[in-house]
From Swiss-Prot:
<feature type="topological domain" description="Cytoplasmic">
    <location>
        <begin position="132"/>
        <end position="160"/>
    </location>
</feature>
<dbReference type="GO" id="GO:0005778">
    <property type="term" value="C:peroxisomal membrane"/>
</dbReference>
<keyword id="KW-0472">Membrane</keyword>
<feature type="transmembrane region" description="Helical; Name=4">
    <location>
        <begin position="114"/>
        <end position="131"/>
    </location>
</feature>
<keyword id="KW-0812">Transmembrane</keyword>
<feature type="transmembrane region" description="Helical; Name=3">
    <location>
        <begin position="89"/>
        <end position="109"/>
    </location>
</feature>
<keyword id="KW-0143">Chaperone</keyword>
<keyword id="KW-0576">Peroxisome</keyword>
<feature type="topological domain" description="Lumenal">
    <location>
        <begin position="27"/>
        <end position="61"/>
    </location>
</feature>
<feature type="topological domain" description="Lumenal">
    <location>
        <begin position="110"/>
        <end position="113"/>
    </location>
</feature>
<feature type="region of interest" description="Disordered">
    <location>
        <begin position="137"/>
        <end position="160"/>
    </location>
</feature>
<dbReference type="GO" id="GO:0030548">
    <property type="term" value="F:acetylcholine receptor regulator activity"/>
</dbReference>
<dbReference type="GO" id="GO:0031410">
    <property type="term" value="C:cytoplasmic vesicle"/>
</dbReference>
<feature type="topological domain" description="Cytoplasmic">
    <location>
        <begin position="1"/>
        <end position="5"/>
    </location>
</feature>
<feature type="topological domain" description="Cytoplasmic">
    <location>
        <begin position="83"/>
        <end position="88"/>
    </location>
</feature>
<dbReference type="GO" id="GO:0051131">
    <property type="term" value="P:chaperone-mediated protein complex assembly"/>
</dbReference>
<comment type="similarity">
    <text>Belongs to the DoxX family.</text>
</comment>
Amino acid sequence: MASPRTVTIVALSFALGLFFVFMGTIKLTPRLSKDAYSEMKRAYKSYAKALPALKKMGVSSVLLRKIIGTLEVGCGIVLTLVPGRPKDVANFILLLVMLAVLFFHQLVGDPLKRYAHALVFGILLTCRLLIARQAEDRPEREERREEQINAQEKNKVKVS
């Protein structure tokens, strides 16, 4: 039977991956929801207007939306299907994307209900990353602890 930590990581990875594939697809194409796609286009236009530096770098609202959508789809697929270290990399990239999205929402003055999802999924991504990293650090700590105990035992003087 799998450990609770493993079950948690797998469940979070799968759920978060599917969510980001879905949301990224909405940003890229109107096939899933025309209304949501139109809303995304409108929102990204306001983000691009609020950051004139993007325009100076040649990043239009369309390009920004497509970059973020592609990152979400790609990293969502990795979180859902790819085992091992690439999941942590995808998790970190998505966490950075969520921070950028929160920044954009704050920049344009959106109310909390417009960006609550980004806040919640940013927290979930952080939790998933912390749990995954904690699971990897534990064997190393135990090995170091055993080495310290062995070193202490060697330094003890036997009294007989």
